[in-house]
Amino acid sequence: MANRKIFLITSLIISLLLIHIFIFSPLNEPEKNAKAGPLGLSDVSVPSAPKLPAKDSTDFEVFLENPVIIFSRPGCPYSAAAKKLLTETLRLDPPAVVVEVTDYEHTQELRDWLSSISDISTMPNIFVGGHSIGGSDSVRALYQEEKLQSTLDEWTHNKVLILPTD
């Protein structure tokens, strides 16, 4: 019984420390007087793109505001297949957001950042509820195995639905 209490207290302390580190520790020192928008892009260049974390912050709001995000590379057949499945074949509510990584001035930094938080360095990199579920092959397999809705439910806490198509 005493070992269980020690384990629970230790687990709680470690969890609180990790939350503190995640929320309050910037990846880099902020730039002084930075005027560029997220990832060095002016805010008016890509009006339909979601707000992405600045290269000098731990701002993960993009994942809170957009439960399904497809980080994509134009011209990539795997990116095209994932976008087609999640934006045309299926009707998601809310709809998936497509982020073309080459639209950003700091493309390589964005790709490195995505790789660091997901251990996936290829495109597309599909995030559901802030968690990478892999690329085109992974999402296609979930769809074919009829596990996509349960994955969406699990990672978004039932906030994304696959609606019937017309």
Swiss-Prot record:
BP-aspect Gene Ontology terms: cellular response to oxidative stress
Domain of life: Eukaryota
Keywords: 2Fe-2S, Iron, Iron-sulfur, Metal-binding, Nucleus, Redox-active center
Molecular function via GO: 2 iron, 2 sulfur cluster binding; glutathione disulfide oxidoreductase activity; metal ion binding
Subcellular compartments: Nucleus
Main subcellular localisation: nucleus
Domain Glutaredoxin positions: 56-159
InterPro entries (alphabetical): Glutaredoxin (IPR002109), Glutaredoxin_euk/vir (IPR011899), Glutaredoxin_subgr (IPR014025), Thioredoxin-like_sf (IPR036249)
Task of the protein: Monothiol glutaredoxin involved in the biogenesis of iron-sulfur clusters. Binds one iron-sulfur cluster per dimer. The iron-sulfur cluster is bound between subunits, and is complexed by a bound glutathione and a cysteine residue from each subunit.
Full protein name: Monothiol glutaredoxin-3
UniProt gene name: grx3
